[in-house]
Design a protein with these regions (language model features):
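ATPase nucleotide-binding head domains, primarily ABC-like/P-loop NTPase cores
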Residues: 291-500
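Charged, amphipathic alpha-helical linker segments immediately N-terminal to NTP-binding catalytic cores
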Residues: 258-305
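Extended, charged coiled-coil "arm/hinge" scaffolds of SMC/Rad50-like chromosome-maintenance ATPases
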Residues: 217-249, 253
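Alpha-helical initiation/capping and key positions within long helical/coiled-coil segments
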Residues: 113, 251, 255-258, 386-389
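Amphipathic alpha-helical coiled-coil segments and their boundaries
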Residues: 107-110, 114, 234, 245, ...
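Conserved amphipathic alpha-helical "coupling/scaffold" segments
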Residues: 1-184
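Structured, charged N-terminal subsegments at the starts of enzyme catalytic cores
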Residues: 168-223
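Long, hydrophobic, amphipathic alpha-helical segments used as structural scaffolds
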Residues: 129-140, 162-163, 167, 171, ...
């Protein structure tokens, strides 16, 4: 049995290695805020959230749409989905309580433990089957439709009756029937467990029916050695069936484990959705397109991590950057540029892992890699100057990127003077654009920004943090020519309370 709720045809691999730039992405996009909102204190949900979001960069369009449809079902049937998740968790936790039986070297102990676990699993599977019978019609996605169809096919009444019958026989309430052969030195070999005779006869028939000849012996209650030998004979006979039953419990356990893992992603999405809905923030399911289409347009896009930590409503942005490879963002200090850049990265990750996005509408091409190059504070761990450190990080990014990747730059190459920083940024941008890399660049380097503006490139767009005439920030971005000032005097007047 397979859940197949993350991919159409394979399981979700929780042991897969994270991207090499995982630490930088987490730091620069403040992903821990998103992960914690998905987990709500649950360590397992946290692990799945982190890996599902970061692994999403490798998803194709079909996988993204597949998950979107499943998530839409989850949002419409949240209580049912959480109930299924609870059943999976309870099954795994109950199995752990019986784990010591698996450590035994004795087949009899292993068999008894497997019977107890399988009895518990049967009860949990019946709960899943009941949910499928009652609620399958309320789910529309391909993933859940296939999941419930699998449950109905695999978990019919005949299956449960057969399992219960086998478990009842394996309890050996009337003893164990074993056949054996004589080997060398008259030692017993080829011990085989046999099915007990049919007990459908009436008690009268059992009394008067002639029985085949049999030879038997009894062991004294005090004969410990004889009892031990008899126990060993029994273990030889039931060894194969004990191992087979243990494998059956492992098979069902692996199903519940994967069901829990794959549903954990959707439970995390439900957790975030609930928090955003409580704050009145909009979400929508994005329209992903192929990498080469170069689409990036949205309405009301906001920073989801900021929204999760703020009490007041967050300002969203409307941008149409379709057919653009380069987006340069300039303008007033503390005008929302870095927040906007973070919202771009977060929305891309959320879209590609199959989530909703923090926007009224969103359409973008998928990227084959997402990288961040943010300015870093100087600290004692740096082995060289800030510019050398920036160039070293840029080299690492280049080593790992492919065509159709996306890079987010935040005030990069500003550790040197204006002219040198602009020249470095200029050379790097030209190289990236030649390789079909999409770039979002927040910068105060006027020569760099205006140099590209003067080129009148069709595949570039220039955004500016809006500033009102009285110096107030609207935290919205508008399309406009880069300016030579970042209005730092506004901050001076605000901090020191002087007149503008």
């Amino acid at each position: 049995m397979k859940a197949f709720l993350m991919y159409k045809d394979r399981d979700f691999d929780l042991q897969r290695k994270l991207p090499p730039n995982e630490q930088a992405l987490t730091q620069d996009l403040e992903l821990d805020t998103l992960f914690n909102a998905m987990a709500l204190g649950d360590k397992f949900l946290l692990e799945v959230a982190k890996k599902a979001v970061l692994f999403g960069l490798h998803n194709d369009l079909d996988t993204i749409r597949y998950r979107q449809n499943i998530l839409q079902d989850c949002l419409k049937n949240a209580s049912i989905v959480r109930h299924i998740y609870t059943i999976a968790v309870e099954s795994i936790e109950s199995e752990k309580k019986q784990y010591l039986g698996f450590l035994s070297k004795y087949p009899d102990t292993l068999l008894r433990r497997s019977i107890e676990v399988l009895q518990m699993f049967v009860g949990m599977l019946k709960k899943l089957k009941h949910i499928a019978d009652e609620h399958a019609d309320t789910f529309e996605s391909e993933g859940f439709t296939a999941f419930f169809a699998m449950l109905n096919k695999e978990l019919g009444d005949e299956y449960f009756a057969s399992v219960q019958n086998h478990l009842r026989e394996l309890q050996f309430r009337d003893g164990v029937l074993i056949s054996a052969e004589l080997g060398k030195g008259n030692k017993g070999t080829n011990y085989i467990l046999r099915k007990p005779p049919d007990k459908k006869q009436s008690w009268v028939e059992r009394i008067f029916t002639e029985k085949p000849p049999a030879y038997s012996f009894s062991i004294s209650d005090r004969d410990e050695s004889g009892a031990q030998t008899l126990s060993e004979l029994k273990d030889r006979g039931i060894n194969l069936v004990a191992n087979a039953l243990a494998q059956s419990t492992d098979h069902i356990l692996s199903f519940f484990t994967m069901l829990r893992t794959e549903l954990a992603f959707y439970v995390g999405c439900l957790n975030v959705h609930g928090q955003l809905a409580q704050k009145g923030e909009p979400v929508s399911f994005p329209l992903p397109v192929a990498p080469g289409e170069r689409r990036h347009s949205f309405k009301g896009l906001y920073d989801v991590c900021l929204a999760l930590t703020m009490e007041q409503s967050i300002v969203g942005n409307d941008v149409n950057a379709d057919r653009k490879d380069l987006v340069i963002i300039t303008g007033a200090n503390q005008g929302g540029k870095s927040t906007f850049l973070r919202s771009i990265g977060l929305a891309q990750l959320m879209m590609q892992c199959g989530m909703f996005v923090p926007a009224e509408s969103f359409c973008a091409n998928v990227c084959e890699g997402l990288f961040t190059h943010y300015k870093r504070k100087e600290d004692a761990t740096m082995k060289s100057g800030k510019l050398d450190e920036e160039l070293s990080r840029m080299s690492d990014i280049v080593d790992n990127m492919t065509s159709n990747s996306m890079v987010l730059f935040n005030e990069s190459f500003a550790a040197t003077n204006e002219r040198e920083g602009s020249e470095i940024a200029w050379q790097i941008m030209n190289a990236l654009l030649e390789k079909h890399i999409k770039v979002f660049f927040v910068t105060h380097l006027y020569e760099f920004a205006h140099g590209f503006y003067d080129k009148k490139m069709e595949n570039a767009i220039f955004l500016r943090a809006e500033r009102q005439t009285d110096g107030r920030r609207t935290f919205k971005l508008i399309e406009g020519e880069p300016l030579q000032t970042s209005y730092g005097e506004d901050l001076y007047h605000r901090i020191f309370g002087t007149d503008n």
